[in-house]
Amino acid sequence: MSSINKKELEKFEKISHNWWNKNGEFGILHRINHIRIEYIIEKIKSNYNDISKLQILDVGCGGGLIAAPLALQGFNVTAIDALKSNVETATIYAQKNGLKINYLQATIEELENDKLYDVVICLEVIEHVANIQQFILNLVQHIKPNGIAIISTMNRTKKAYLFGIIVAEYILGWVPKNTHDYSKFVKPSEIYEILTDTNIEIKELKGLVFNLAKNEWKLSNDIDVNYFMCLEKKMNSLSSTCNGIPQLKRVI
């Protein structure tokens, strides 16, 4: 079953040339990108002693906002996206900046089943796919044993609707109107339920919040709007656990 949402693809295809315009439709991603990269690298280093030969997969890579900085840090990155125009934009940027990244136009379903990676990354993608459950199960299938995945998305709360849609799209104009569909936002507990009876452990939940007084973004324990989730594929466990995460236990 495909996770492609054709309406979402059409929406992003119209602006796919503008990924690297810091003042354009993806400007908000540029403003939070240093936090995203720092978080990813922190999780990688906490899981691996030797990071020199790690294989990283970036799913739904867009124009390469995650793949490019990681490649610049010396990581071996494969990045996939369903949109040809996104891959073209990402490839052009990589070539101009001398970055070696294996870009592929592909969905997670089209990736060969035996292709496994030490780190699988999927940021701000889940809320745009057609079948969230199948997408997540396909995603974690490509993690090597004892490897990790880092995903981020938006929580389905009243607070997320207020700040993620009303404020971000209609008041501040951080992202184009109709970028998000509230019904596609995902509660952490729903991801936990999807991963039940798998060998995937949820290691951490971390929120990303905007401090209006300081005009800056920061990591937080507040997961009501944006959140990161770090997963680990265990060798022997057959049941997903929440690793004692209080925010997750509270909403299950």
UniProtKB/Swiss-Prot annotation:
Its EC number(s): 2.1.1.222, 2.1.1.64
Keywords: Methyltransferase, S-adenosyl-L-methionine, Transferase, Ubiquinone biosynthesis
Pathway terms, separated by semicolons: Cofactor biosynthesis; ubiquinone biosynthesis
CDD domains in UniProt: AdoMet_MTases
Reactions accelerated catalytically: a 3-demethylubiquinol + S-adenosyl-L-methionine = a ubiquinol + S-adenosyl-L-homocysteine + H(+); a 3-(all-trans-polyprenyl)benzene-1,2-diol + S-adenosyl-L-methionine = a 2-methoxy-6-(all-trans-polyprenyl)phenol + S-adenosyl-L-homocysteine + H(+)
Binding-site positions, S-adenosyl-L-methionine: R36, G60, D81, L123
SUPFAM superfamilies the record matches: S-adenosyl-L-methionine-dependent methyltransferases
Lineage: superkingdom: Bacteria
EC class name: transferase
One of the GO biological process terms: methylation
Molecular functions per Gene Ontology: 2-polyprenyl-6-hydroxyphenol methylase activity; 3-demethylubiquinol 3-O-methyltransferase activity; polyprenyldihydroxybenzoate methyltransferase activity
Function comment: O-methyltransferase that catalyzes the 2 O-methylation steps in the ubiquinone biosynthetic pathway.
PANTHER family the record matches: METHYLTRANSFERASE, UBIQUINONE BIOSYNTHESIS O-METHYLTRANSFERASE, MITOCHONDRIAL
Family recorded in the similarity comment: Belongs to the methyltransferase superfamily. UbiG/COQ3 family.
Protein name: Ubiquinone biosynthesis O-methyltransferase
Organism, scientific name: Rickettsia prowazekii (strain Madrid E)
